[in-house]
């Protein structure tokens, strides 16, 4: 290698190892970031699309795990979903930074190494990329971008066990339903914005679910590691969330929600995480949101190993 080439290479090196920036990333940028991570860490990552949005954008899922490409006996399946309301954008960036954190700390951080070795972690940063494209930063309260391109709220679009949901199933919803059916997910959470609370099932019934103690425990496990959420009074106009958690229906009823669909139809426990008072806050706040949620997102994944794990084989 010549001296000139060496200097060029050294000049490029900081760009190659530069940390992910704290800003919002559009769909093209998000795709490029995921493909770059996959190319740099091929042994422990897998990137796939579960379908397309109304406008044809891919719904990318990024997998981190020692066995990333397929289910392995004894390795539980975990998922995080963000940005199903397109204008609720913080969770989208939290998941990108979580990916970076897992990859860059694998084999150097004992907790991360154990998680990646013993868990198959699926991350869907944007369930509603069309809505995200239609929304704008610093919009805290409007519904611009909340819905998919066809005008449907994706968190009101799933089958509901408590009352019939007659809305046509949207492409994004269908893709997620197919994804859930194709994997044996055990634990999940989906990210939202507009409040600071961890919400658990049921969303559309005041009936106490059979696993109520487990659901409350999981919600509090996330909340107690996020001091802003746990304080229960972080957002103006919100109060009464003891320890930063709430039953979904007690807060407000949701028909056709993804949380209940996971739990009732697929035996996958899911909680809903409201992680920012402002739905689409200024990008300058993103590093703070990552710092607030970093411990929680790791601690919550660890809970997939709580209790007994069984694999049933039918011959």
Regions inferred by a protein language model and the residue ranges of each:
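Soluble or luminal CAZymes and related metallo-dependent hydrolases
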Residues: 26-29, 167-172, 214, 285-292
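Short glycine-rich, acidic/polar surface loops and turns
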Residues: 246-266
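Active-site/substrate-binding loop(s) of hydrolase catalytic cores
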Residues: 67-220, 224, 228, 232-236, ...
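Catalytic cores of secreted or luminal carbohydrate-active enzymes
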Residues: 266-308
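Acidic/histidine-rich, surface-exposed loop or edge segments in extracytoplasmic proteins
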Residues: 16-22, 80-82
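Soluble metallo-hydrolase cores and metallopeptidase-like ectodomains found primarily
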Residues: 22-78
């Amino acid at each position: 290698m010549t001296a000139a080439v060496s200097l060029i290479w050294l000049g490029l090196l900081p760009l190659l190892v530069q940390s992910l920036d704290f800003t919002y990333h559009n769909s093209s940028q998000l795709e490029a970031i995921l493909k770059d991570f996959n190319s740099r860490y091929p042994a422990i990552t897998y990137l796939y699309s579960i379908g397309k949005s109304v406008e044809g954008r891919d719904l990318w899922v990024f997998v981190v795990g020692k066995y990333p490409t397929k289910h392995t006996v004894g390795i539980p399946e975990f998922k995080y979903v963000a940005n199903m309301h397109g204008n609720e954008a913080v969770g989208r960036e939290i998941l990108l930074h979580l990916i970076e954190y897992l990859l860059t700390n694998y084999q150097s951080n004992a907790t991360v190494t154990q998680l990646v070795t013993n868990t198959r972690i699926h991350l869907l940063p944007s369930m509603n990329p069309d809505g995200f494209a239609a929304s704008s930063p610093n919009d805290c309260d409007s519904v611009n971008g909340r819905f998919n391109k066809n005008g449907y709220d994706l968190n009101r679009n799933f089958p509901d066990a408590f009352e019939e949901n007659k809305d046509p199933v949207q492409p994004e919803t269908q893709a997620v339903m197919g994804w859930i059916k194709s994997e044996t997910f055990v634990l999940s959470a989906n990210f939202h914005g507009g409040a600071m609370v961890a919400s658990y099932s049921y969303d559309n019934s005041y009936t106490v679910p059979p696993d109520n103690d487990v659901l409350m425990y999981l919600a509090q496990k996330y909340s107690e590691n996020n001091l802003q959420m746990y304080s229960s009074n972080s957002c103006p106009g919100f109060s009464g969330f003891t320890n930063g958690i709430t039953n979904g229906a007690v807060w407000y009823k949701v028909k056709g929600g993804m949380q209940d669909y996971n739990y009732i139809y697929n035996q996958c426990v899911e909680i809903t995480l409201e992680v920012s008072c402002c739905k689409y806050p200024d990008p300058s706040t993103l590093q703070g949101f990552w710092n607030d949620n970093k411990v929680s997102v790791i601690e919550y994944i660890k809970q997939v190993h709580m209790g007994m794990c069984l694999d049933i084989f039918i011959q």
